[in-house]
């Protein structure tokens, strides 16, 4: 039986990828359907209750700059906000929010249910209808079929999902939710490469049984950051602290003594887990010299008694999990309310996708999220947004769009996946981007909002606010360029008081702002350079643009230069162990493959463009580059 209405785009799955994938074409004016097995779990945070972090916060800002939901939901649900790397350069500063699971889910559900052009239907999708290598519809468990021109699959860990606790296992998409077995079987019949990955989650603890009095507190920032360019601090709910404890030798002994009951160490689990979010078993075995590991006790919400112990993801049996928890300071009498577990699931080789996230084999079929081999809410959401945009463009027979590596972290993510593929869950880091000074959190809107407006993704309020900010930036920079101070000026004494060395030649306001001891606040407190702007976002961009102007221009030149290094030779005896800045993973692959050129090195799976930039710098230092390279 076919449903009475046809849809332009159908999205399967209502997680972080599915949410953004459904909203994007709907905002573009296309009739969109979101199919989910449970409307009440839309936007569910399946693992850690947090949004953002290093690299991930950049993705959230980019999603927001293009009209996406994640940043707004985080602002409405964040119960502890922090700016990570705040003492470092602007390229690596990142926003992170501890989130209330219930508030986050509510924010997502409200946005979806009130989005024009978007319908939501609760049914498990069991088949994707295909004719002559083109998508034509979706079939559901109850036999109902929907006609469509495009399908976006965002099934997360649900495809063939298998949950492991100790040596026991059962099918499931996550704890409490069924796996998508029929759809997984159907997809395995398609001309797409499929494999298995694994991820895990820690046990949840009863806050009433934790001795917080003897634990260190971790508060959020005094000056709360905001995720959305349209957001404000007033949207944030009440802020609360996290707490810190540590594993110890007793904890590690419990783990070592029970590895024969671990599904990972007995070969029961075959899927590869995330390198940068290892289980506590892996931490203890891989870092045998460490006597302890820091564990963050993160509240799951303002009205919840559940605590998320960040750092002890495990699939060991429940009785072992209890011993692990009770071995730590402050948790001696703590009860577990939900056991930790590992989950294996199907993922598809992202090298079978176009950079638009459309499959190469089937027209109109797009993949987004964990089924492409990524890990993390933010990575999933950014893929969902990109797939949603391109599904919308596809049904309108318009030219596709995807960001370049020098344009967005979304571009880095998609290029890495579609070009290199992955054999382990992939997450974004700032170190993966070779042009990260151009890809800051603060300028995500200037990079992407004009494109979003052209694509029809943002409303006129956001567009007007963006243009006002851009005008404020340009007006203020022009004002500072036009104000000059001379060595014989009457204002000289006052200005010299804030300078590390006296002024000996004329300087503009921008010249002074470039000096390391001067910031915008100090400069505009001086009578000559008053008044300061009220637009704090514009102030931040003015200061960064002025102080880092030379570096920014250099990176823009590097973008053009990078294209010329395809045939740059690497000596046979080149010693990669002497190259500072390469990760152990990249160094091992270069040693193994011994590439003969930069071009060849760049195509080795796992060797990032950032690593190529480091190699080029070292080759230049050693006089191995020809003039002009």
Swiss-Prot record:
Annotated positions binding NAD(+): 273-287
Coiled coil: none
Domain of life, source organism: Bacteria
GO molecular function: flavin adenine dinucleotide binding
InterPro entries: FAD/NAD-bd_sf, GIDA_C_N, MnmG, MnmG-rel, MnmG-rel_CS, MnmG_C, MnmG_C_subdom, MnmG_C_subdom_sf
Signal sequence, start to end: none
Sorted UniProt keywords: Cytoplasm, FAD, Flavoprotein, NAD, tRNA processing
Pfam families referenced in this protein's UniProt entry, alphabetically: GIDA, GIDA_C_1st, SAM_GIDA_C
Subcellular location, record wording: Cytoplasm
GO biological process, one term: tRNA wobble uridine modification
Listed cofactors: FAD
Disulfide bonds: none
Amino-acid positions noted as binding FAD in the UniProt annotation, renumbered to this chain: 13-18
SUPFAM superfamilies in alphabetical order: FAD/NAD(P)-binding domain (SSF51905)
GO cellular component: cytosol
Described function: NAD-binding protein involved in the addition of a carboxymethylaminomethyl (cmnm) group at the wobble position (U34) of certain tRNAs, forming tRNA-cmnm(5)s(2)U34.
Subunit structure: Homodimer. Heterotetramer of two MnmE and two MnmG subunits.
Membership in a protein family: Belongs to the MnmG family.
Protein name: tRNA uridine 5-carboxymethylaminomethyl modification enzyme MnmG
Lineage per the UniProt record: Bacteria, Pseudomonadati, Pseudomonadota, Gammaproteobacteria, Pasteurellales
Encoding gene (name): mnmG
């Amino acid at each position: 039986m076919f449903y009475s209405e046809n849809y332009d785009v159908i999205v399967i799955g209502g997680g972080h990828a599915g949410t953004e994938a459904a909203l994007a074409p709907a905002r573009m004016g296309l009739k969109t359907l979101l199919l989910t097995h449970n409307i009440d779990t839309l936007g569910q945070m399946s693992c850690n209750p947090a949004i953002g972090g290093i690299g991930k916060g950049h993705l959230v800002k980019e999603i927001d700059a293009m009209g996406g939901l994640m940043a707004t939901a985080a602002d409405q649900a964040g119960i502890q906000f922090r700016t990570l790397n705040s003492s470092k350069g602007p390229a690596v500063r990142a926003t992170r929010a501890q989130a209330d699971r219930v508030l986050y889910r509510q924010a997502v559900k409200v946005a979806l249910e009130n989005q024009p052009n978007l319908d939501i239907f609760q049914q498990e999708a069991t088949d994707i209808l295909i004719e002559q290598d083109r998508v034509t519809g979706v079939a559901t468990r109850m036999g109902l079929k929907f006609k469509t021109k495009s399908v976006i699959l965002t099934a997360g860990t649900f495809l063939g999902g298998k949950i492991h606790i100790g040596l026991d296992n059962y099918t499931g998409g996550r704890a409490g939710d069924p796996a998508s077995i029929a759809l997984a079987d159907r997809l395995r019949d398609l001309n797409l490469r499929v494999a298995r990955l694994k991820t895990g989650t820690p046990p949840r603890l009863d806050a009433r049984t934790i001795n917080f009095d003897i634990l260190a507190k971790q508060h959020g920032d005094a000056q709360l950051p905001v995720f959305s360019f349209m957001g404000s601090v007033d949207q944030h709910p009440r802020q609360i602290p996290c707490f810190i404890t540590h594993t110890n030798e007793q904890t590690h002994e419990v783990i070592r003594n029970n590895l024969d009951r671990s599904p990972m160490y007995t070969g029961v689990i075959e899927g590869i887990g995330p390198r940068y979010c290892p289980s506590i078993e892996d931490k203890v075995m891989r870092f045998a010299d460490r006597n302890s590991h820091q564990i963050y006790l993160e509240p799951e919400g303002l009205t919840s008694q559940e605590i998320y112990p960040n750092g002890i993801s495990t699939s060991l049996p429940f009785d072992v999990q209890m011993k692990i928890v009770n071995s730590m300071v402050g948790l001696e009498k703590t009860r577990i309310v939900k056991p930790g577990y590992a989950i294996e699931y199907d993922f598809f080789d992202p090298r079978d996708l176009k950079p638009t996230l459309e499959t190469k084999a089937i027209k109109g079929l797009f993949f987004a999220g964990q089924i492409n081999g990524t890990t993390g809410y933010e990575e999933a959401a950014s893929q969902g947004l990109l797939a949603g945009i391109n599904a919308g463009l596809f049904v309108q027979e318009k030219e596709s769009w995807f960001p370049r590596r020098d344009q967005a972290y979304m571009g880095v993510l998609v290029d890495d996946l579609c070009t290199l593929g992955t054999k382990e869950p992939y997450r974004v880091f700032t170190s993966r981007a070779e042009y990260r000074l151009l890809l800051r959190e603060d300028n995500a809107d200037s990079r992407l909002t004009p494109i979003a407006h052209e694509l029809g993704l943002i409303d006129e309020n956001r567009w007007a606010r963006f243009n006002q900010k851009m005008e404020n930036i340009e007006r203020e920079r022009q004002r500072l360029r036009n104000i000059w101070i001379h060595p014989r000026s009457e204002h000289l004494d006052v200005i010299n008081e804030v300078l590390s060395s006296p002024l000996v030649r004329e300087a503009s306001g921008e010249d002074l702002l470039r000096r390391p001891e001067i910031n915008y606040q100090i400069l505009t407190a001086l009578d000559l350079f008053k008044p300061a702007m009220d637009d704090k976002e514009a102030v931040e961009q003015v200061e960064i643009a002025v102080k880092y102007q030379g570096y920014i221009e250099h990176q823009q030149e590097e973008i053009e230069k990078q294209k010329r290094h395809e045939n740059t030779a690497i000596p046979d005896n080149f010693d990669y162990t002497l190259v500072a800045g390469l990760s152990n993973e990249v160094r091992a692959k270069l040693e193994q493959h011994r590439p003969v050129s930069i071009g060849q090195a760049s195509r080795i799976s796992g060797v990032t463009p950032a690593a190529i930039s480091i190699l080029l710098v070292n080759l230049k230092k050693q006089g191995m580059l020809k003039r002009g390279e």
